[in-house]
């Protein structure tokens, strides 16, 4: 692995940079199980809250709108948290979604000196036979010389409810399909696009959204699924030309090969305003 690329993923991006709240992440150990525990200490998944006995008000459902780790820590500090290692009741945690667990996980890894990045794609372990919208994070394992996927959302309760048979600290490639891989699988006719999505949204539009989210996340700009910055994020695939499909096919190929040719990938994304997240969207709120 290119040492410059690992250094890139070791450094914070705008969504994980921590400024005024550094005391809340002081002395994070370079130990993935502990980092995941810290993530679970501070976040409660919006769509699992009932399983933990927490009923959400409309106001609490707005908490995932805070994108950046700094903003999340500020929110938690106001709720009485002093450090991410503190264990509190589920009701005292901040409400988030899978993206938040993954972005915070990547941020804490970087604080611990571990290269990491959030990934958007689809999980096969939520609904049998379907590829459901999801996020994980990857960290670089020096000993194994490879990226290892982690699902920081899957605590003991969720593992039991979902009958998870794999280690959430080492998610397999068949368990989580990244956005670019999913797109190319469907374009090659190796998977049914209508099996990819969540809730009432399925098909190529959702595949495109998660590819765009993953590509920008690999440039350390992990957006929320509902963020709409125009370009291909807003244009339904039913309205695409052959040229549009060719562009996104190429994006998928370059994103899948990000480690082999980061320069080609980053140049392609940053050179296409219909793909790249605009600067005004990028803020650690």
Q: How would you name each of these model-derived features?
A:
Residues 2-92:
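Secondary-structure boundary elements
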Residues 2-15, 36-45, 52-59, 122-135, ...:
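His-Asp-centered catalytic microenvironments across diverse enzyme cores
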């Amino acid at each position: 692995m290119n040492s410059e690329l690992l250094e890139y993923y070791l450094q914070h991006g705008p969504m994980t940079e921590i400024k005024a709240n550094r005391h809340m992440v002081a002395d994070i150990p370079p130990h993935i199980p502990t980092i995941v525990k810290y993530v679970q200490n501070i976040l409660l998944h919006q769509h699992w809250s009932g399983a933990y006995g927490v009923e959400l008000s409309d106001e609490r459902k707005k908490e995932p709108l805070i994108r950046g780790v700094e903003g999340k820590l500020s929110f938690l500090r106001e709720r009485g948290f002093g450090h991410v290692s503190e264990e509190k009741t589920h009701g005292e945690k901040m409400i988030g979604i899978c993206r938040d667990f993954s972005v915070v996980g990547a941020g804490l890894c970087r604080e611990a000196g571990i290269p990491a990045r959030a990934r958007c794609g689809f999980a096969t372990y939520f609904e049998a036979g379907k590829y459901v919208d999801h996020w994980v994070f990857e960290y670089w394992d020096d000993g194994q010389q490879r990226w290892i996927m982690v699902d920081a959302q899957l605590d003991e309760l969720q593992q039991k409810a979902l009958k998870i048979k794999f280690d959430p600290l080492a998610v397999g490639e068949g368990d989580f399909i990244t956005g670019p891989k999913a797109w190319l699988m469907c374009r090659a006719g190796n998977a049914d696009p209508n099996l990819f999505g969540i809730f009432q949204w399925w098909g190529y539009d959702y595949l495109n959204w998660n590819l765009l989210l993953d590509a920008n996340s690999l440039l350390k700009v992990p957006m929320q699924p509902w963020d709409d910055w125009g370009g291909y994020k807003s244009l339904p695939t039913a309205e695409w030309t052959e040229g549009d499909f060719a562009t996104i096919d190429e994006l998928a190929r370059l994103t899948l090969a990000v480690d082999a040719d980061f320069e080609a990938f980053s140049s392609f994304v940053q050179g296409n305003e219909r793909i790249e997240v605009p600067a005004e969207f990028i803020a650690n709120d």
